[in-house]
Amino acid sequence: METKDLKKLAKAELHCHLDGSLSLDTIRQLAALAQVDVPQDDSELKQLVTAPETCESLMDYLKTFDVIRPLLQTPQALTLAAYDVVKQAALENVIYIEIRFAPELSMDQGLTATQVVEAVLKGLEQGQKEFGIVAKAIVCGMRQSSLDISREIFANVLEWANKGLVGFDFAGNELDFPPAVLADLIKETQAYGLPFTLHAGECGCPNYIVDAIDLGIKRLGHVTAIHNQKDLLAKFIANDVTAELCFTSNLQTKAARTVEDFPYMQLRQAGAKLSINTDNRTVSDTNLTKEYELFVKHFETSVTDFLEHNRDAIKASFASPAEKEALLDRLEKAYQSYIKK
């Protein structure tokens, strides 16, 4: 398929980080609001906020986020940022998106976690009204931070549960802070009633995927370490888990050292549920259309495959049952003309 056709395909995205996905124009607006100097030249600014094509590691990749953190410290900035990412998604025919962020990273200048979430939800709502997309929020704890900080944040933001906030996650340094370290807090938070997704297996540790599945988590981000793990793949499928795949990001961070190390084909051939995602649109210099192009190029993914992956994404989403039904109907209708070709 040509790029223009891939762009026209209806899409759903489950794994997109707010602070890693801001457009250059919005970064400039945010910098002006924060009175922070950034390069006026697009190529210079892009170099500042985009990770190298090949990083030394995940931690090397994450350094890029340090540039954005000071720009997301006010309600106005957070609302603008959330609106920007929704707009970007809608313009490439994403009909459903879950945008995740860590309130802790926007609390440097006195905002509370509740204020951070409120501001992000305001931006999501503006984008939904303007573009006809459905956009939800996932709140992340940072793995490397004190568990007490994440515990307090998760508890405090519950007032927004099912008012746009639909789930929780842990992001950050997986290698040193595996699921076992987070297990008790994850169980506590699951008791609140909102679902969990979790970054798992991005650092090359299959056991971290096992631990996440054993916590009853039904959506896992990256799962790169499932590659060539036959028993783990069987467990993944038996537990009805959906993979949130992030191809470009995984190659950058060396989670997958080569295209052959990326687990998509093994997941697909085994009948596992999966979704295709950007992870970080700006940091990885990508969007969903680019990701789809790469899947066509490297894996010969077909329109029928994309339809199936988007069905999986919507079914595994944290949207309400009624929203899922409407989104699935919209998805099927959008693909009818392409499937017939």
Swiss-Prot record:
Sequence positions that bind Zn(2+): H15, H17, H199, D279
Q: What is its EC number?
A: 3.5.4.4
What keywords were assigned to this record? Hydrolase, Metal-binding, Nucleotide metabolism, Zinc
Pfam families referenced in this protein's UniProt entry, alphabetically: A_deaminase (PF00962)
> SUPFAM superfamilies of this UniProt entry?
Metallo-dependent hydrolases
The protein's site described by Important for catalytic activity is found at: H222
tRNA-binding recorded as keyword: no
Residues where substrate binds? H17, D19, G172
Per the Swiss-Prot or TrEMBL record, the active site comprises E202 (proton donor)
Sorted alphabetically, which InterPro entries does this protein's record hold?
A_deaminase, A_deaminase_dom, Ado/ade_deaminase, Metal_Hydrolase
Q: Does the keyword Hydrolase apply?
A: yes
State how the cofactor is bound: Binds 1 zinc ion per subunit.
Q: Give GO terms for biological process.
A: adenosine catabolic process; hypoxanthine salvage; inosine biosynthetic process; nucleotide metabolic process; purine ribonucleoside monophosphate biosynthetic process
Q: Name one GO cellular component term.
A: cytosol
What role is this protein assigned? Catalyzes the hydrolytic deamination of adenosine and 2-deoxyadenosine.
- Family classification: Belongs to the metallo-dependent hydrolases superfamily. Adenosine and AMP deaminases family. Adenosine deaminase subfamily.
Protein name, per record: Adenosine deaminase
Q: Show the taxonomic lineage.
A: Bacteria, Bacillati, Bacillota, Bacilli, Lactobacillales
